Every structure is written in structure tokens, then in C-alpha cells.
């Protein structure tokens, strides 16, 4: 079986300081209380009835109310010039914001963290955009580049940051260019609908995973020639019911983050195909990496694309011990 889910084009722009080309998916899209129950009067005669015991033993439901964190560019800590701003007021929450107001039609932002992994994004102007600090605590270099000719770029603005993230899960709960949602997003409403009545985060993950794999079909035409710098419009994907690997992962990640479940959108290679999948965190299990199914004890690698398009036997053979997946970046 040959699996080629996301044939992806790549930019050939030359950034200074040996910066890599833009990520294949680097261009941005435009854009807990427990529920109260009714008071119940139970007489002493009813207290030991089977119905009462069943109620007493029932597992409490989790709160399905969405929580959509909102990135902010407060201006309290910035690097700026006359055409660009890097706002790191909330770097302790695991993100920075950037805005470009100049006239250059092609602008990129590059983030290099303490693990030396380089993330390159397209930066559009017209307002602040949010970028995760995915590499944890440490020193980050954040640089904005303007195209000067052909594929050549020059530094426009930079900031060197010493980042200490207060909550390690924050980068994977806030929206960003790759996982782009708000409280008004349709994916958030659908996530709440799917989470209603669930008793645990694992049940929510299962319900959302099942919904995505059963209701979104793979778009082979789009995968064969994806737009340069593609990122997902998650509501459009939900409405159309079709998408490529990044779309599956972005929709599921948006739903789960809005349900307070830390979720990493991960990009790398599945054998020789450039691919996207997700990993999730629960308090009971820690990070669930490489999840396809739950056997009662173990989850591994959440890959909603393969889950939707591959039979169980083939899927399990491909996943194996996870060695077919090579993680490069996470958002």
C-alpha cells in the first residue's frame, strides 16, 4: 500500500542566516464548574432502592461549556519600528503576536526556540497574528523578514526573548495560525455538542475523533496540488466535509482545545509523505502520542486522516510502534 496523503509544494525563498524556506503550511487563514442538577427529595424509604443506588454510582458528567482563550497584544512588551511590531506581552502564556503595516507584499516571520527547530510563517498584515512558542522554556529568536527581490529576504525586525512559560499546556490551548478558532466558530459549537453528556476527557476525545473520521472525507485533488503556504479554515472544512491531513488535524485540535483539552497539531513525515496529525493530553494518561484507538488501557497517535481513510488492520500495521511517523514541528 502506498500512502501519499499530502503532496505539498514548498517555497524556495532564501532567508538570511541559513533560514529554511517557509513551512508548507505556513500561510495564515484569514480571519470549571460542574453543571448544576435539579434538587431531588428522596425519602428514607427510597434511599436504598436500586434506582437510588444507580444514581449514586453514576459517574458525574464533565462540563462541556467551551473555553476559548483569546490571544492579546497589549503592547506592554514589544519590539517595533515604523512598519512592524512583535508583541511578546504574553510570552509567558506560550505565544507571541506580530503585525506588519508596511507595503512589502511578501513578509515572513521566523521563530527559533531553545531546541533550535526553526518555524517559518507567512505574515500578512492587517492586524495581529498569533504564533505559538512550541519549544518550552528558553531563549527564542523572533524575526520578521521582508522580500527584497526574487527569493531574497532582508531582516525587518527582530526580538530576542528569554521565555518562561507559566503553564506548559498554554501553547496547545490558545488558537494560532494553524489551529485558528474563536468562541463564534462553528467547530467550537460542534465540539460542545459532541462533548455534551460525556463523563471524561477520554470520552470527549473518542466522540470527536469518531465524528471527524466519519464525517470528513479525504480530498485527493486538493492534496495533489495544495496552495503554497496552506493553512486550514476550520469552519469551511466542517461545512464542506472534505479536507486534507492538515484540515483533519486542525478541526479536531480546535474542537479539543475549546473543550480545555491540550492538543498539539504535529507536522512531519508518515513514511515518505508530508503529513499532519495530533497528540492530546489528559490528566489520567498524560500526553497521548500516536493515537488510533483505545483498547481499555492505552492510547497512541491521534491521526484522524488515516483513521478516516484506512481499514483497521492496515492502519494498525502502518502505525506499528510509531516509527513510521517522524515529528518535525508542533503547533
Predicted regions and their residues:
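Short, conserved helix/loop micro-motifs enriched in His/Cys and acidic residues
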Residues: 214-243
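Alpha-helix capping and helix-loop boundary segments enriched in small/acidic/polar residues
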Residues: 118-119, 240-243, 266-269
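Hydrophobic/aromatic-rich core segments of domains that either
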Residues: 247-331
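N-terminal accessory/pre-domain segments preceding catalytic cores
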Residues: 2-200, 287-290, 324-331
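Surface-exposed patches in mature extracellular/periplasmic domains of secreted proteins
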Residues: 199-205, 219-228, 263-269
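Loop/turn elements at helix/coil->beta-strand transitions in domains of secreted/extracellular proteins
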Residues: 200-206, 214, 233, 257-264, ...
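Glycine-rich, acidic and aromatic/proline-enriched surface loops and short helix-turn segments
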Residues: 204-221, 307
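Active-site nucleophilic cysteine motif
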Residues: 204-208, 241-256
